[in-house]
Amino acid sequence: MQMTPPTRHRSVVTTLLPWLLFAASMPAVAGDCLPKVEGAWIRMPPVAMPMMAGFARIENPCSSPAAVVGAESLAFADVSLHETRQEAGISRMREVERLPVAPGKAVELKPGGLHLMLHGPYQPLAAGEKTVITLKLADGRALPVQFEVRKSAP
């Protein structure tokens, strides 16, 4: 039996239509929503040092959890997440492997707490300069963020 053009068209539509409706009814993919970063800055050390620290506010406006699991920059040999804590009156720093940000919440990277540790700048950075640090998210996406070098907190 040979199909006439209108019958063939109807067959294609009736085959594809359920799949198109199914795809259209799917919830938005997590990739549609990204955390937002505000107030990103790097503290310029008083003297040339092989390490610097980066700070910012990371907000998750999405309906699903997000997590920062790493960072990188072309301006530094290594970038990692760290946390400073007071233990028995002594300030201790430890690396943080995963920084969760709950839906509708924010996390502050600030002096004396969570921060980005920036090791080995490839060239000296001056106050007012800007450089990009890319945050790596747990779902495999990358979030490039522009950081401004400052002598003190904004």
What are these regions (language model features)?
Residues S25-P27:
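N-terminal signal peptide c-region/cleavage motif recognized by signal peptidases
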